[in-house]
């Protein structure tokens, strides 16, 4: 698979099933992350850094975005960030305030969460030419409010000319499994809202991850719908 002249293709894959402190476990986040990591490494020549369960505690995530990524990413790199786990959103002055829930988060204590604003700011400071974030968690769409810049929603159909511009020029893209305005969920009763399906190898995945994996294996739409 062509790498489009990138010096480095780096993927950070985060998946959390087993939460601490009474937060309900998830059933497929780790399996989803492992499957995504395998495809990115073998089919797309990515160097993959995986943080699963205990490796995805708050201090580990902060170390990742503040120190590890800046030391690994160059101007001609492409970076992909995949997160599967719990997410929440709260009302903020400028729109929903989104948070990713680390493995060791304390329910009700936002200081123990990873805010989407801090994540966005750390990622935006990286010099990589291409960046893609994929969030499979509740309220993932709140990430768009983390930026003070105008955010453009990509059309359902991307024609070849526009795709080539994305590929050749600096680009920042975000894909989410959920919108920002889902009904608020009590953080004290976080549940597995991601759902699950079973693939042809009897592996359980969230519906979003199953569709993503199918696309990464070459079954994504490649022409406008009829």
Language-model-detected regions and their locations in the chain:
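Caspase-like (clan CD) cysteine peptidase catalytic core
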Residues: 8, 58-84, 88-150, 225-226
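Short catalytic helix/loop segments, enriched in acidic residues and glycine
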Residues: 26-41
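Second-shell loop/turn segments in exported
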Residues: 22-27, 50-54, 108
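Active-site-proximal C-terminal subdomain of hydrolase catalytic domains
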Residues: 15, 33, 52, 128-226
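Terminal peptide-recognition signature
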Residues: 15, 36, 81
């Amino acid at each position: 698979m062509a790498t489009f002249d990138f010096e480095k293709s780096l993927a950070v894959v985060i998946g959390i099933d087993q939460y601490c402190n009474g937060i309900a476990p998830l059933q497929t986040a780790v399996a989803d992350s492992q499957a995504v990591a395998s495809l990115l490494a073998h089919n797309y020549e990515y160097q993959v850094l995986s943080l699963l369960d205990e490796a995805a505690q708050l201090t580990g995530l902060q170390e990742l975005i503040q120190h590890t990524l800046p030391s690994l990413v160059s101007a001609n790199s492409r970076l992909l960030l995949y997160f599967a786990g719990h997410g929440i959103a709260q009302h903020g002055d400028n729109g929903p305030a989104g948070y990713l829930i680390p493995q060791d988060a304390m329910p009700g204590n936002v200081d123990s969460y990873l805010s989407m604003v801090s994540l966005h700011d750390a990622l935006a400071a990286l010099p990589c030419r291409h960046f893609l974030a994929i969030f499979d968690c509740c309220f993932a769409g709140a990430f768009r409010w983390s930026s003070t810049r105008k955010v453009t929603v990509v059309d359902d159909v991307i024609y070849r000319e526009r795709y080539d511009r994305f590929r050749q020029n600096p680009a920042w893209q975000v894909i989410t499994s959920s919108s920002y305005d889902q009904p608020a969920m009590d953080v004290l009763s976080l549940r597995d809202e991601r759902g699950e399906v079973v693939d042809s190898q009897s592996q359980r995945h969230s519906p979003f991850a199953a569709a993503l994996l199918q696309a990464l294996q070459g079954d994504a739409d490649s022409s406008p719908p009829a």
